[in-house]
């Protein structure tokens, strides 16, 4: 039976992981825009991979389910790489929650119903999920366990509670990691694993939008002051993705792999840490 690797989001990171885990397998490359899928498929095809393309809107259940049907029609789904999403500079809070949070929950649910024994999935989250302050235990459980079609109705996600695109993005990415942790239990019953990767600033078209957007100065400061002193590359994320999806990652599931060049470390213990603004705060 043919083994199928599904790549959702035809960008640089999804391609980088796919190149490392898809040799001898059939790649189903899906994107919201056919031209993006076709361009990525040409690159992979020219590198010797067998590729089909599809259009998917991850914020629509019927679209994600249709992609599942295409995938199982090609063979056994042995891998799922979910790298689709929108950033704070690209969309409204409502769209970010719909695509990045709800869409990820849909992908995990729908592909968790068909993933083959021995299979593995990777969801691309973000360092931003680690920048969000602590949620309550009840909020953690709600993001992890609320039935998918009820997720966006949570009180904590309503427009009067989430008014800023960055807040929506941070909530979504924290939710991705929590959702994957919960889904790992269900995937495990099928003999499969699933994890998240939380990259920092990785040079992709999406990152370039952020670097030239309203928060660009802050992102450039992160690059300058993080321990690594540079941005990351899609190939570096691809290497971690290959570990998590391959045999050497066989004991890793329900986990989140933060790879941000030390930005989060610098925010907590280094030069990026928020500075007290008054003498009282400094001695508190």
PLM features: residue spans?
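Rossmann-fold cofactor-recognition segment
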Residues: 44-62
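C-terminal helical subdomain
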Residues: 106, 161, 168-169, 174-177, ...
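Canonical Rossmann dinucleotide-binding motif of NAD(H)/NADP(H)-dependent dehydrogenases/reductases
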Residues: 1-28
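Conserved Rossmann-fold cofactor-binding substructure of NAD(P)-dependent oxidoreductases
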Residues: 59-75
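Catalytic loop of short-chain dehydrogenase/reductase
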Residues: 87-90, 117-190, 201-204
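A glycine/serine/threonine-rich, flexible loop-to-helix segment
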Residues: 135-146, 202-225, 266-284
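Conserved glycine-rich Rossmann-like NAD(P)H-binding loop of the short-chain dehydrogenase/reductase
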Residues: 24-39
